[in-house]
Swiss-Prot record:
Stretches of the chain forming a coiled coil according to its record: none
Main location, first listed in the record: secreted
Keyword Magnesium: no
Glycosylation sites: N42, N156
Organism encoding this protein: Drosophila melanogaster (Fruit fly)
Keywords: Acyltransferase, Disulfide bond, Glycoprotein, Metal-binding, Secreted, Signal, Transferase, Zinc
Recorded family membership: Belongs to the glutaminyl-peptide cyclotransferase family.
GO cellular component: extracellular region
Protein's name in the database: Glutaminyl-peptide cyclotransferase
Active site: E170, D218
Length: 340
């Protein structure tokens, strides 16, 4: 990913998911209802935290693990495989992994991250713990800890489904450019934009237009991360994360006293897997730590330098956010910059 310099003005908040005052007081009950499963999280992270450059054996193993995990969690799983020429290696096979609950739903909440690790010719052992093994583990662990809700009350809803997207080929093989980056998300966005579903497919919206918001996780796992709002149209969703964190902290459900989610709009953007979706007018909630962790793209981005209290805190806030979004969803949410 890369930091850009696009500046925009915030026109106000879309307070879609802010907990009402009585619910703020009982946030601890929500936090207790959906308990941590650290055994699952640690096992998941261990399975992903290996060198996984596109085309490597480790990459293939992690891909298979993601498919197996999604199937085991009750998702309908699809592998979006394609070949493309890249710098250094020539032609490689990429594979996005997508899991869906309620695939026939009108709209979707999409949670995403990338699973490939960066290629360093002088560091074949680079594992990219924050970039993005931990985000992968967070998505699977969120599905696991919310499993009782997702597999019973939520299943077969027609208004909203849940997508977990594990992008391949986010990392540049040489230097970050529009061409040498986000290979998987470009392919998947184009595929979703070209297809429609339903018995009257010609009249149906494009599949990409059924995504209400793409929530993209990246660079998570270091000590005391900070998350700002990047896009005006999803600032209300970011504000809900701020409020959930505050409520859980008040209820004694979080560790330490460092706030992760900041009530501020960033003056710059971070280029990442969301770019092709943003180009297709998909609302994006970009949860990337800024400033970047000091271990970013160094050999120190490994398990030894992860900060477990920060990871647990993020997991708890994010789990509640996902649950509240799905639980309170009653009608389509259109946050697009222009209407479709």
């Amino acid at each position: 990913m890369a930091i850009g310099s696009v500046v925009f003005a915030a026109a106000g908040l879309l307070l879609l998911l802010l907990p009402p005052s009585h619910q703020q007081a009982t946030a601890g009950n929500i936090g207790s209802q959906w308990r941590d499963d650290e055994v699952h999280f640690n096992r998941t992270l261990d399975s992903i935290l290996v060198p996984r450059v596109v085309g490597s054996r480790g990459h293939q193993q992690v891909r298979e693990y993601l498919v197996q995990s999604l199937n085991g969690l009750g998702f309908q799983t699809e592998v979006d495989e394609f070949k493309q020429r890249v710098p250094v290696f020539g032609e490689l096979t990429f594979a996005n992994v997508v899991g869906t609950i309620n695939p026939q739903a009108q709209n979707f909440l999409a949670l995403a991250c990338h699973y490939d690790s960066k290629y360093f010719p002088n560091d074949p052992g680079f594992v990219g713990a924050t970039d993005s093994a931990v985000p992968c583990a967070i998505l699977l662990n969120t599905a696991k800890t919310l499993g009782a809700y997702l597999q019973k009350e939520f299943r077969n809803r027609s208004d909203v489904g849940l997508m977990l997207i594990f992008f391949d080929g986010e990392e540049a093989f040489k230097e970050w450019t529009d061409a040498d980056s986000v290979y998987g998300s470009k392919h998947l966005a184009a595929k979703l934009a070209s297809k429609r579903s339903g018995s009257q497919a010609q009249l149906a919206p494009r599949n990409i237009d059924r995504i209400e918001v793409l929530v993209l996780l990246d660079l998570i796992g270091a000590r005391n991360p900070k998350f700002s709002s990047f896009y005006e149209n999803t600032d209300g969703l970011h504000s809900s994360l701020v409020q959930i964190e505050k409520s859980l902290r008040t209820a004694g459900q979080l560790e330490g006293n460092n706030n992760m989610f900041l009530s501020r709009v960033s003056g710059g953007l971070v280029d990442d897997d969301h770019r092709p979706f943003l180009d297709e007018n998909v609302p994006v909630l970009h949860l990337v730590a800024t400033p970047f962790p000091d271990v970013w793209h160094t050999p120190r981005d490994n398990a030894a330098n992860l900060h477990w209290p920060s990871i647990r805190n993020f997991n708890r806030v994010f789990r509640n956010f996902v649950y509240q979004y799905l639980k309170r969803h009653t009608s389509p949410v259109n946050l697009r910059f222009y209407r479709t």
